[in-house]
Regions:
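Core nucleotide-handling region used for phosphoryl-transfer chemistry
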Residues: 2-457
């Protein structure tokens, strides 16, 4: 048996086995205490003892069989022991909650409770071994997999579509995308998972995290459909009959779907039924040079006057008279640029290069809030083993960066999403620090069953 990360796992929603040996008293509640998991605080009852726990992050969902076995459902009828009552709703989602003014960010389940479930329900003996700090979402045994937790996504109802037009001619699809040329954006890690990732002497960039639709625009090598003449040419030049011809071409995508991957079909309009990515592509495409990929956020309104993200206008106004104008009805803000050569080797623009390239070429990057050494942001914090803890506590509440404030870029009063942190070390990675106000807004939307474009685009 083994604890594993599935192929679909999102790094921010993995469960983690932790060894909790110390607690802090809750500042405002005599019957609670606080455990620390990386950069997170988790409120617990006074009776909880030191030992191994499984940490489940906020907005992950726990397997219903585990919740039932451990009697954690609020609905007693769902629990193994119907006389016991927990606090999880039917969806099994882990929520952040302020308890007497102190945020509790996640849920800790005794490791023994999880192993007892596995032994009793799956008939698998969990060996005694050092499992501290293992991250996982799946338990694998006897060539079988059992999911433990995953990111909570609102289920989308699907409805059968009747074919009223009779038999339709099928369209042959040709996928032109080379996975060595086009790359989706990496998952941005929650900094509270890795508070040690930034050290005092690191050169860092802080930019505003804005709430819109992720997008990718690329001018990279693609496959070209072969004509009869191309195939004959292949034979005459000693190549395989079906060997693809490569050309530079334009691609654009949402966070997880390439909209024009195929030559023949019309681009996929996606979540909105309207191709906002195609509209944004018209803005970015003229600036792309061979090998370049630009990653950006689209904010404001859709062509039919809906918010791209509910209530987040970013200074835009709804379109009128069938006009959809950049910087008036929607905005595109660049946050990452790469260059990929013909061999598939990618160069990552530094955070400062992204800012300068955009300004030199007439595009607008995300707002840069700070650029410099981490230690110089708050020079009064002593550089010792507690530096990271104090640094992130200070940053999480820094009004200069609009933390726990309304968005400075929106006319509507909506919570600022937070900050993106990058380290200038030529590695393709970034971290994010969200405001608690924004996290609470996300939770309320999940409770209301409101779909998120980033999960469905």
């Amino acid at each position: 048996m083994v604890w594993e990360k599935s192929k679909e796992a999102n790094i921010n929603y993995l469960s983690k086995i932790v060894n909790i040996q110390q607690f802090e008293p809750h500042p405002n509640a005599d019957k609670m205490k606080i455990a620390h998991v990386d950069g997170y605080n988790v409120c617990m009852g006074l009776d909880e003892q030191p030992g191994l726990y499984v940490y489940f992050p906020v907005n992950s969902t726990i397997n219903p069989n585990i919740l039932s076995y451990c009697n954690l459902y609020r609905d007693c009828e769902k629990n193994k022991d119907a006389t016991k009552k927990g606090f999880f709703e039917d969806n099994g989602r882990v929520t952040a909650i302020k308890l007497r003014g102190t945020p509790s960010e996640g849920f800790l389940l005794p490791y023994e409770a999880l192993t007892s479930f596995i032994q009793d329900s799956l008939n698998v003996v969990v060996p005694e071994e050092d499992v501290t700090n293992i991250e996982f979402d799946t338990f694998t045994y006897n060539n079988k997999s059992f999911w433990i937790s995953k990111k909570y996504i609102i289920p989308v109802k699907s409805y059968p579509v009747s074919n009223q037009s009779g038999r339709k001619r099928s369209v042959k699809r040709f996928n032109r995308v080379l996975d060595t040329q086009f790359r989706f954006h990496y998952n941005t890690t929650l900094i509270k998972k890795e508070p040690w990732a930034i050290q005092p002497n690191d050169l860092i960039s802080l930019t505003s995290k804005i709430h819109g639709a992720s997008s990718i625009f690329a001018y990279v090598l693609c496959r070209k459909p072969l004509t009869i003449l191309d195939r004959i040419s292949n034979i005459l030049t000693g190549k395989k009959w079906s060997e693809n011809k490569l050309i530079y071409d334009y691609l654009y995508a949402s966070r997880s779907v390439i909209k024009n991957a195929n030559y023949n079909p019309n681009p996929n309009p996606g979540y909105y039924g309207i191709d906002i990515w195609g509209e944004a592509n018209k803005v970015i495409k003229p600036f792309l040079t061979k090998g370049m990929t630009i990653y950006a956020e689209i904010v404001g309104y859709t062509p039919d006057g809906k918010y791209i993200q509910k209530n987040y206008d970013y200074g835009c106004v709804p379109p009128e008279n069938n006009e959809y104008v950049s910087e008036k009805n929607f905005k595109v803000r660049v946050y990452r640029i790469t260059y990929t050569n013909i061999d598939g080797i990618t160069h990552e623009f530094s955070a400062r290069e992204v800012q300068q390239w955009c300004k030199n070429n007439g595009l607008i990057p995300v707002t840069e809030l700070y650029y410099g050494f981490a230690k110089d942001l708050y020079p009064d914090i002593p550089i010792n083993e507690d530096w990271a803890t104090k640094f992130w506590e200070r940053l999480a509440n820094d009004k200069n960066f609009y933390m726990e404030c309304n968005s400075p870029e929106c006319n509507n009063k909506v919570p600022h999403e937070g900050i993106v942190i990058k380290k200038e070390d030529m590695h393709a990675r970034a971290w994010k620090l969200k405001t608690y106000a924004f996290l609470n807004k996300e939770q309320l939307e999940l409770d209301a069953g409101e779909l998120n474009i980033e999960d469905n685009a």
